[in-house]
């Protein structure tokens, strides 16, 4: 989804030979993560998707401890999850994560949970960037350039 006309977005440039969208992170469903019906509990999906975002940030050189040390935090302001097909114990899954949009002080992320080629769930997240004081702040140019390889155009989104 394109930003509204007149809405500034962070200026980004793609880094040559950098990883590109989507970021992929494998996980295995563990027995204790199941609900009473033998399916992966809905709350675990949110945790898995968060793991996917954190792994992408780490790969981009934006680990949470480093961000905190530089005075930045990512704060989730909205999550929308669609549960399509259940996962069960022992399933080997892949979390795909992409950055859909970078704005001045927020970002929009798209994610998919896959079992092979089958999409089990999707999630869209809006995360604000704040200072350690909790107030919104702008993305630094370095943060934007590190996330650029994971940024997809509206037509490219797989997550």
Model features per residue range: what roles?
Residues 2-25, 58, 83-92, 99-159:
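HotDog/MaoC-like acyl-thioester-processing domains
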Residues 31-89, 144:
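N-terminal first-folded block
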